[in-house]
Amino acid sequence: MTLYDKEINKNSLLIPMVIEKTSYGERSYDIYSRLLKERIIFLTGTIDDNTANLIVAQMLFLEAENAKQDIYIYINSPGGVITAGMSIYDTMKFIKPNVNTICIGQACSMAALILTAGKKGYRYCLPNSRIMIHQPIGGYNGQASDIEIHAKEIIKVKRKLNELMAFHTSQSINTIEKDTERDCFLSANQAIKYGLIDTILSYRT
């Protein structure tokens, strides 16, 4: 068993279980599986390929279950790998159900793009959440010609991300480029004014 496996096993012990009584007896679910029945998906922690694959699989499953019912993604993430985040983004746009996004805690970097990519009018934030947008971070070691190739690629990626952010927020490309030159933190109220979200949720109605 590797240290990684031990860490997974340790974390799995912390996941609450829910017991439901049915006509066939009792059935137990981990809390995330139970919430998935309510079409709720959690995007938490760093966005990597493994996390993205799980989120994508859950969205595809919920679409297969009911293509007309909304999906809810709760986000508390510092961001992560661009390609992993884009796989989530593209799947949100690919599937038929509307995807509602809710920021709880923080939505930074790629997580901010996923948050603002939710269905227009159904992008939410809790009152004390924060959102951070910035330009992509990259680093590469190797031959000069390879470094040049990767530098050109990250510039193209930056341009694409800025275009998507501008589309979803209705901000100009110039504004997005200026604001993402450095880490740009926004409160829930600032995020509404910026166009990243639509509503702050203080309590259930």
UniProtKB/Swiss-Prot annotation:
GO molecular function: ATP-dependent peptidase activity; ATPase binding; serine-type endopeptidase activity
EC identifiers of the protein: 3.4.21.92
Localization of this protein: Cytoplasm
Signal peptide: none
Entry superkingdom: Bacteria
Broad EC category: hydrolase
Catalyzed reaction equations: Hydrolysis of proteins to small peptides in the presence of ATP and magnesium. alpha-casein is the usual test substrate. In the absence of ATP, only oligopeptides shorter than five residues are hydrolyzed (such as succinyl-Leu-Tyr-|-NHMec, and Leu-Tyr-Leu-|-Tyr-Trp, in which cleavage of the -Tyr-|-Leu- and -Tyr-|-Trp bonds also occurs)
Active site as annotated: S109 (nucleophile), H134
PROSITE patterns: CLP_PROTEASE_HIS, CLP_PROTEASE_SER
InterPro entries linked: ClpP (IPR001907), ClpP/crotonase-like_dom_sf (IPR029045), ClpP/TepA (IPR023562), ClpP_His_AS (IPR033135), ClpP_Ser_AS (IPR018215)
GO CC, any one term: cytoplasm
Record Pfam families: CLP_protease
Keywords carried by this UniProt record: Cytoplasm, Hydrolase, Protease, Serine protease
Biological-process GO terms, alphabetical: protein quality control for misfolded or incompletely synthesized proteins
Principal cellular location given in the protein's record: cytoplasm
Family label: Belongs to the peptidase S14 family.
Oligomer status and interactors: Fourteen ClpP subunits assemble into 2 heptameric rings which stack back to back to give a disk-like structure with a central cavity, resembling the structure of eukaryotic proteasomes.
Function in brief: Cleaves peptides in various proteins in a process that requires ATP hydrolysis. Has a chymotrypsin-like activity. Plays a major role in the degradation of misfolded proteins.
Protein name: ATP-dependent Clp protease proteolytic subunit
Organism: Buchnera aphidicola subsp. Baizongia pistaciae (strain Bp)
Lineage: Bacteria, Pseudomonadati, Pseudomonadota, Gammaproteobacteria, Enterobacterales
